[in-house]
Amino acid sequence: MLNGKRILVAPLDWGLGHATRCVPLIERLLRFGAIPILGADKGPLAVLSAEFPSLEYVRIPGITVRYSESGNQLWSMAKQFPAMLRSMQTERALFEGMRAKLRLDAVISDQRFGIRSNALPSLLITHQVFPFTPFAQSVLRKVNLRNIARFDRCWIMDEQRSPGLAGELSHGAELPGNSRYIGILSRMAPIRNSPSESTGAKYRIVAVISGPEPQRSLLENILLEQMQGIKGEHLVVLGLPDELDQKQIKNITMIGHMQGSKLARAMSDSEMIVSRSGYTTLMDLAALGRSALIVPTPGQEEQEYLGRLHAGTGRYIVQQQNSIDLTTALGTTADQPLTPQHSGSDLLDEALGDLAGLLQ
């Protein structure tokens, strides 16, 4: 369907989630005969290059976002907002300069509004059609919709039925005319006949830490302190792809990063999973059919909203970072039984068929 078409896949570089959720998309492009080119930098590029070592790549730098140590991110984000706008303009100019050299037929951008061109089919993948922001939300939502309209297509990573996983973020009264749902995107798949099914879980707790500093490290320190007082073996995945050495602190194994299949097995072979309430993580949990203790990043509007949403749906246990209690969470079960959801559904195949039509 896409035989020989050179398609750039460019994830946003705020943490690793945007890169990891591009993995199943890249796999599907390869299956359809396309030639994906990876467009990323630093951690996201390290993740994608590890998953696809033979693929061509190009470095596309982005802005480094830092969160405040306090729970109030308003002033921190406001100070960085002008740099974010400049970054969008810079990456647009950079992309136009490299487009011809890369001999691209199309581009798929994960939340990078500057990675598009009027000269070739440009697709945006997102779950943030109607984003939550700490200030001027109605104005910024209009700006977001205007940016979405500049792409030929907008693929929404969520279930069609509201509230889905993203709730109001992806289900509004009126969706953009160029949008369609493609289901969840996750590099995870259910592990059949895992050791935990017959002999008990290998790990009591598997914690997957992610996101910008300093909040990533703050959560790491809280979890490590509490885990040392809980019997059993625990695993902490630090969300640091450049950290190659495995470390052991008492009953806790610490590793910088794990590829999808290994992480899926570890998560499936645990009594409890702990993670942020980032959207990519929620898609991974849905693909595995696992609940988790989710901890929103303090002051991160979207994660706090998703925490509130799923405290109500009963899919997950939700605790705030300043009141994490792992012992209590271990004794709690989520209200709603979960069934693994298939990632890379027929909806994605239909969207790729539409892309093939644009390329004719």
Residue ranges and their predicted role:
Residues 11-23, 215-217:
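A short, glycine/small-residue-rich beta-strand->loop->alpha-helix junction that serves as a flexible
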